Amino acid sequence: MSANAFGKLFTVTTFGESHGPAIGCVVDGCPPGLEIAPEEFSHDLQRRASGKSRHTSARREADEIEILSGVYEGRTTGTPIGLLIRNTDQRSKDYSNIAQQFRPGHADYTYWQKYGIRDPRGGGRSSARETTMRVAAGVIAKKWLKQRYGVLVRGFLSQLGEIRPAGFDWDAVEDNPFFWPHAAQVPELETYMDALRKSGDSVGARVDVLAGGVPAGWGEPIYGKLDAELAAALMSINAVKGVEIGDGFASAAQKGTEHRDLITPEGFRSNHAGGILGGISTGQAVTASMVLKPTSSLRLPGATVDADGSVVDVITTGRHDPCVGIRATPIAEAMMALVLMDQALRHRAQCGDVGEISPRIPGQVDV
C-alpha cells in the first residue's frame, strides 16, 4: 500500500526515521536453517557507515544490530526476522533553522505536498539513514545466495565527478574509503574531495554492481523481469537518478552485430546485455550501474520558499555527505542481492520440477 515493503516471496519492510530512536526492518520469506549471527552484519554495515573518513558525513553511529525474531540458536527459523538498530548520534538542533524551509533538490517539498506534515530532522524518512536496514537485510540475502548457488555480489565506485578509473583491481576496492578500483588514483580523489568540501559544494557519482555465478533461468516475463525489478530496486536508493543494465544507454550507438552476445558451446563471447535476456538471467554475470545526483544539502545559500510561501535563502548546517555515491556501493550490492534472492525463490517455486535443460551454455569466455 504505502510502499515500505519490497519483494514478493523474500520481502523486506523497513521502518524508522533519521533522527528517531531507532531504525529497523522485518525480513520475511527467508528459508529456515541459514546460520546467522549479529556479528555477521558488522562488515557491510561499517562499509556503509558515515564518519569513517573525512570525505563522508561526520555523523557516527555504532550501527549495532539487534536480532529480535526469526533466529533461534543461531539459525533462521523460517519466520519473520526482526532487525533493529538504535540511533545514537542525532543532532536535531542542526535543522531547527530550516524546519519550515524546503531545501532545493531535496524531498522536503514533495513530502510536504504528499502528507501535509514532515519530519525535518535529518530528512526524516527520506534520509539515506534508511538504507542501513537495506544493507542489513542484504547481508542475509548475500549469505544465502553464496551458500545455495555460489553467487557473489560486489560493486565499486566507477565515477566521481568527472574522474573515472584509470585501471581496475578488485583487491583495491576494499582498501580505500571510495571503493575505487585503482589504488594509484586515491590521492587524486582525496585532493578533489578536500577542495570540494572546503568550497561547500557537492558532486555526483556512479556505482557499478555485478553478481557472478547467477544460474540461467531467474526472472519472470513479462512484468517480473529480472532487469526491471533490479532497475526499480536501484532506482529506489536515495539520490539515484539513472540506472543501466549491461551496456545500458551506450546501446543506442551500437549496431546489432556489435551488441548481440554471440553464443558458442564454450560460452557467450560478450556480455553487452548484462547477463539478462527477455528478463531472464543467461548464466553470465548480472551487471548494472546507477548514477547518483549531487547532495542537495549545502552550506552555500540557495533560493527557496518556506511553508508560508515566502521567498528565503536556505543554508544547511547539518552533517552531510559531499558525495553520497562514496557510501553507495554496499547499498547497491544489498539491493541486487535482495532482488536475486527473491527471484531465486520464485523460480524455485514455479520451476523446481524442471530438469536440467540442454544445452547449458557457460558464462562469458575471453576472445
Curated annotation (Swiss-Prot):
Record: residues binding FMN: 125-127, 238-239, 278, 293-297, 319
Pathway: Metabolic intermediate biosynthesis; chorismate biosynthesis; chorismate from D-erythrose 4-phosphate and phosphoenolpyruvate: step 7/7
Job description of the protein: This reaction introduces a second double bond into the aromatic ring system.
Any one GO biological process: aromatic amino acid family biosynthetic process
Domain of life of the source: Bacteria
PROSITE patterns: CHORISMATE_SYNTHASE_1 (PS00787), CHORISMATE_SYNTHASE_2 (PS00788), CHORISMATE_SYNTHASE_3 (PS00789)
GO molecular function: chorismate synthase activity; FMN binding
Pfam hit, one: Chorismate_synt
Region Disordered, residue ranges: 39-60
Assigned GO CC terms: cytosol
Protein family: Belongs to the chorismate synthase family.
Name assigned to this protein: Chorismate synthase
Keywords for this protein: Amino-acid biosynthesis, Aromatic amino acid biosynthesis, FAD, Flavoprotein, FMN, Lyase, NADP
EC number, UniProt record: 4.2.3.5
Cofactor(s) recorded in Swiss-Prot or TrEMBL: FMNH2
InterPro entries membership: Chorismate_synth, Chorismate_synth_AroC_sf, Chorismate_synthase_CS
Broad enzyme group: lyase
Entry-linked Gene3D superfamilies: Chorismate synthase AroC
HAMAP family: Chorismate_synth
Residues at which NADP(+) binds: 48, 54
Summary of subunit composition and partner proteins: Homotetramer.
UniProt catalytic activity: 5-O-(1-carboxyvinyl)-3-phosphoshikimate = chorismate + phosphate
Cofactor info, note text: Reduced FMN (FMNH(2)).
